[in-house]
C-alpha cells in the first residue's frame, strides 16, 4: 500500500493562504520558476491553476505540458511537490468562476485588483505527489464532530413541517451548531433572473425581499454557475461584496419600478473578510442559495464548504417538498425554479 500523500490529505495546502511555486521547461530543457497565486482542488485526480499572464510559464506549458508545483501547508510548514500534466484551459463555467471570485478576494487583500485578472483556469492531471523532506510542525488534530454536527442539522431540517420553520431552523442550526453568526437564504425567481432574500440571521435588518441578480457577486455567481463559491481573504470593500451594493444603488431609481426589492437594504456585512455561497439544488433544478459570511479571515475552510453543501442539498429538497405539499400553510412568494 502506497504511503504517498493524496490530494485530499494535502487540501490545506490548496486554500490559497500561501502562493505556490511552479517549475516548467521549454522544449530545449531550459527551466523556468514562477510564483502562482492559485492551486485549486478540482477532484481527487485534478487541480486547477490560475492563468493570469501570457508569460514564460504559459509559453512553456503550451509547448511542454509537464510541470511541478511546490505547495506549503500553512499550519505544519511542510512542503509537497505535485507532478502535473496540463490538459486544458477553461475560461467559463463553475471552476473558472469560483477561481475568479477567489482571486478577486486575494486581489483586494493585496491591493492589486487591476493586476490580478483571471484569464483562464488551467486544468492539470495530478500524476503523483511527493512529500519533500524537511522539518515541520506537528499536524493539528483533525476537526472532530463534523459528521455529528451535520447529523444534528439534518435532524432539525427533517422535523420541520412549514417553510418558515424550515428556513429559520436551518439558520438557527448554522448559528448554534456551526458558530456561523451571519447567514441568509435567497430564493430564485427564474423569470426575473433574480435571487431574493427570504430569511437571514445576525444582521441589524433582515433584508427580506432584497434582491441580487444572477451572476452578481459571490451569491449570484454561485447561483448562475451552480457551484459553491468561497472567498477567504476580503478586506475594505472587496470587489465581490460592495459591487452588490453599488449595483443596487445604481438600479434603485424611480425609473425602475419593476425591479422589485431593490429599495430594500441588502443585509450583508459592510466589510466581510470571508464568504461562502452554496447553491440550493433539488432534482437538478436551482431553487436558491445558502450564504454565510464572517468578519474574520479564513473563517470557512473546505470542510465547512463540504458540510454546507451537504446541508444545502437536504434544505433544497425539503423546500421543494413543502412547496409542493397541499398542506403548506406558509408558502414563499411565487418562486420559479430554473430547469436543469
Please report, for each region that a protein language model flagged, where it lies by residue.
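Regulatory sensory and allosteric helical modules in signal-transduction proteins
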Residues: 205-268
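Short, structured beta-strand-loop surface elements
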Residues: 56-102
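Short hydrophobic/glycine-rich mini-motifs in sensory/regulatory modules
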Residues: 280-290
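A short, aliphatic-rich beta-strand micro-motif
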Residues: 255, 263-265, 273-281
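Signal-transmission linkers at sensory-effector interfaces
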Residues: 134-163, 321-338
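Regulatory loop-to-helix N-cap segments in sensory/regulatory domains
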Residues: 270, 287, 293-311, 318-327
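Amphipathic coiled-coil signal-relay and dimerization helices
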Residues: 32-35, 193-201, 210, 231-232, ...
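Amphipathic alpha-helical coiled-coil segments that mediate homodimerization
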Residues: 149, 153, 162-181, 185, ...
Amino acid at each position: 500500500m502506497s504511503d504517498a500523500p493524496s490530494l485530499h490529505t494535502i487540501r490545506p495546502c490548496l486554500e490559497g493562504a500561501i502562493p505556490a511555486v511552479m517549475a516548467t521547461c521549454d522544449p530545449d530543457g531550459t527551466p523556468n520558476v514562477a510564483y502562482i497565486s492559485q492551486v485549486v482542488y478540482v477532484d481527487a485526480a485534478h487541480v486547477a491553476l490560475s492563468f493570469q499572464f501570457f508569460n514564460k510559464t504559459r509559453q512553456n506549458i503550451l509547448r511542454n505540458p509537464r510541470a511541478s508545483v511546490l505547495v506549503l501547508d500553512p499550519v505544519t510548514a511542510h512542503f509537497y511537490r505535485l507532478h502535473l500534466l496540463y490538459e486544458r484551459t477553461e475560461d467559463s463555467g463553475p471552476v473558472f468562476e469560483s477561481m475568479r471570485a477567489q482571486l478577486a478576494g486575494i486581489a483586494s487583500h493585496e491591493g492589486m485588483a487591476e493586476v490580478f485578472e483571471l484569464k483562464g483556469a488551467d486544468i492539470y492531471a495530478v500524476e503523483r505527489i511527493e512529500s519533500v523532506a524537511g522539518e515541520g510542525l506537528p499536524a493539528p488534530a483533525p476537526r472532530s464532530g463534523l459528521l455529528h454536527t451535520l447529523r444534528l442539522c439534518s435532524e432539525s431540517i427533517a422535523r420541520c413541517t412549514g417553510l418558515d420553520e424550515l428556513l429559520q431552523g436551518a439558520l438557527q442550526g448554522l448559528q448554534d451548531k456551526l458558530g456561523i453568526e451571519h447567514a441568509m437564504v435567497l430564493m430564485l425567481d427564474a423569470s426575473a433572473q433574480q435571487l431574493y432574500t427570504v430569511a437571514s440571521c445576525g444582521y441589524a435588518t433582515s433584508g427580506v425581499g432584497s434582491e441580487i441578480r444572477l451572476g452578481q457577486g459571490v451569491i449570484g455567481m454561485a447561483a448562475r454557475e451552480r457551484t459553491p463559491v468561497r472567498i477567504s481573504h476580503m478586506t475594505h470593500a472587496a470587489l465581490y461584496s460592495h459591487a452588490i451594493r453599488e449595483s443596487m444603488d445604481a438600479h434603485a431609481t424611480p425609473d425602475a419600478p419593476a425591479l422589485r426589492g431593490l429599495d430594500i437594504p441588502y443585509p450583508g456585512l459592510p466589510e466581510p473578510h470571508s464568504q461562502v455561497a452554496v447553491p440550493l439544488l433539488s432534482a437538478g433544478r436551482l431553487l436558491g442559495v445558502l450564504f454565510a459570511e464572517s468578519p474574520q479571515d479564513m473563517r470557512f475552510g473546505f470542510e465547512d464548504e463540504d458540510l454546507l453543501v451537504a446541508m444545502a442539498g437536504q434544505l433544497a429538497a425539503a423546500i421543494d417538498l413543502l412547496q409542493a405539499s397541499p398542506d403548506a400553510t406558509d408558502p414563499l412568494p411565487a418562486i420559479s425554479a430554473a430547469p436543469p
